[in-house]
A protein has these predicted regions:
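Small/polar-rich, solvent-exposed N-terminal microdomains that initiate assembly or binding
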Residues: 1-64, 152-164
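Extracellular/virion structural assembly segments
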Residues: 1-21, 64-69, 76-105
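Acidic-leaning, charged glycine-interspersed low-complexity segments
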Residues: 20, 24, 44-49, 93-145
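Short, internal active-site loops enriched in acidic
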Residues: 35-37, 77-79, 121-127
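Short, solvent-exposed beta-strand/turn "edge" segments of beta-rich domains on protein surfaces
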Residues: 60-67, 127-131
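Intrinsically disordered, low-complexity acidic/polar segments
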Residues: 61, 81-83, 147-151
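Oligomerization/assembly interface segments of phage tail-like spikes and tubes
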Residues: 66-82, 132-146
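Hydrophobic secondary-structure block in the mid-to-C-terminal portion of proteins
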Residues: 134-164
Length: 164
């Protein structure tokens, strides 16, 4: 299932946002750093996909296009009450794992990135922000399939001269 219009977006963030939005109105999407998320989560009342502003990455230059490979952190967080015994929060962690699975499935279906497969480590988030949230954070290897076209011509003038 390729998301309509997603190929026209030039940034990794726009592609991630489009995937998150395709998951329905029951999921909030945030793109910001952890400090901004700390403030924003105060007003959030539903499970959220938080794409943390990447601190670094790699640009892969080839003849006709550039592909972006950001170092990503994507949080799957839900507001929670502070729970000392952890029973309720364990249930929320499992729900956020399911949200992460749904997100990765949608990401793979978008065909904007190389397939995410294999073992993907996660970190459990509990009492990490000022607002009580519970969830997980994945560091997903987002590798663009198409990237950005930087050369509209199919061949170079030098290549045509050599063939003569």
């Amino acid at each position: 299932m390729e998301l309509k219009g997603i190929k026209k977006y030039g940034t990794v963030e726009a592609k991630v946002r489009k995937v998150a939005e395709s998951m329905g109105e029951d999921v909030e999407y945030l793109f910001m750093n952890w400090s901004q998320a700390n403030v924003a989560m105060d007003a959030i009342t539903k499970p959220s996909v938080v794409y943390v502003l990447p601190p670094s990455g790699k640009l892969d230059f080839s003849y006709a296009r550039v592909k972006d490979y950001p170092e990503t952190q994507i949080g799957f967080l839900a507001p929670t009450d502070f729970d000392f015994d952890g029973t309720e929060n364990d249930n929320i962690i499992e729900q956020m794992k399911r949200l992460a699975i749904k997100f990765v499935k949608a990401l793979n279906a978008s065909k904007c990135f190389e397939l995410i497969e294999g073992k993907q480590p996660y970190q459990v988030v509990y009492d990490f922000l000022d607002q009580n949230v519970t969830g997980i954070v994945l560091n997903l290897p987002l590798e663009e399939v198409d990237g950005i076209i930087i050369c509209d011509e199919e061949s170079r003038y030098e290549d045509e001269k050599e063939g003569s």
